Curated annotation (Swiss-Prot):
Belongs to the octanoyltransferase LipM family. InterPro entries: aa-tRNA-synth_II/BPL/LPL (IPR045864), BPL_LPL_catalytic (IPR004143), LipM (IPR024898), Octanoyltrans_LipM/LipL (IPR050664). It comes from Carboxydothermus hydrogenoformans (strain ATCC BAA-161 / DSM 6008 / Z-2901). It catalyses: octanoyl-[ACP] + L-lysyl-[protein] = N(6)-octanoyl-L-lysyl-[protein] + holo-[ACP] + H(+). It is an enzyme of class 2 (transferase). Monomer. This is Octanoyltransferase LipM. Residues 31-239 form the BPL/LPL catalytic domain.
């Protein structure tokens, strides 16, 4: 059976996590390496913005400062995610690889099958969603599922985003364990109070977390084990535990210094 790398990381800052993900992508391009799966968490609450989001228009930086929330821009698209009580995954690999090949949506579907099996390993029956249009778009990622994202009883529990460079992709996503809705709605701006209250009122019908659908609370280790097994079964691969290479560490530090820790990157839109 084919072998992929698995990196099991602890907590990093938002900027560090984005720098590491991009470093893995860039080094995969440089070295044509095997696909990599990484699990990680966050040292403090972090609001990550999609690549094209407008930080000044959509983020309440005053509230972020009061609440100790870091703000970072992702290299991937999509909408804002508040990372706190979650396990985050990232996958890097070649789109020429048969297990990751195809269009963006086709590779999304292949990755989502592993996520679906991860939920099943926790005793949670999820579904792979078909995207739906909404007339009341907000900055919030979990406000509505996109194509091939994971839902449970119609509520989005895993949100993902992807970027491609040449023949390689990076996809990362939030596996939400529990959600602080109050904090999420405090750190984002809305067009009006009416819009904010309308979206918030419907939010619980559209978004959920693992602990909303289980009679017991899982440890982080149990959740990691469930999703690692899910990806292994979904992709039909073995994972070998790995660490960042010297070049990956050096590049992540460079990206942190020159990109993800800079105001130029955060406020580029």
């Amino acid at each position: 059976m084919e072998t992929w790398r698995f990196i099991d990381h602890c907590s990093f800052s938002g900027a560090e996590n984005m720098a590491i993900d991009e470093a893995l992508l860039q080094e995969a391009i440089n070295n044509h390496g095997a696909p990599v799966l990484r699990f990680y968490t966050w040292t403090r609450p972090t609001l990550s913005l999609g690549y094209f989001q407008k930080a000044q228009e959509e983020v309440d930086f005053s509230e972020c400062e009061k609440l100790g929330v870091e703000v970072v821009r992702r290299p991937t698209g999509g909408r804002a995610v508040l990372h706190e009580f979650e396990l985050t995954y990232s996958i890097v690999g070649s789109i020429q690889h048969p297990k990751l090949s195809g269009t963006v949506l086709e590779s999304y579907l292949k990755i989502s099958k592993g996520l679906l099996l991860g939920l099943k390993n926790l005793g949670i029956e999820g579904e792979i969603a078909e995207g739906k249009k909404t007339s009341d778009l907000s900055a919030i990622c979990f406000e509505a599922p996109s194509w091939y994202e994971l839902t449970v009883m119609g509520r989005k529990v895993i949100g993902s985003a992807q970027v491609r460079r040449g023949d390689y992709l990076l996809q990362h996503g939030a596996i939400v364990i529990k959600m602080d809705v109050d904090k999420l709605f405090r750190v984002l701006k809305f067009k009006s109070l009416e819009q904010k209250e309308r979206i918030r009122a419907s939010f619980h019908r559209k978004a959920g977390a693992i602990h909303d659908f289980s009679s017991r609370e899982f440890s982080l280790a149990e959740i990691k084990e469930a999703f690692l097994a899910g990806f292994s079964e979904g992709f039909e691969v073995n994972f070998i535990r790995s660490e960042l290479s010297l070049k990956e560490r050096e590049l992540s530090r460079q990206l942190l210094r020159e990109k993800y820790n800079t105001r130029e990157w955060l406020f580029r839109f």
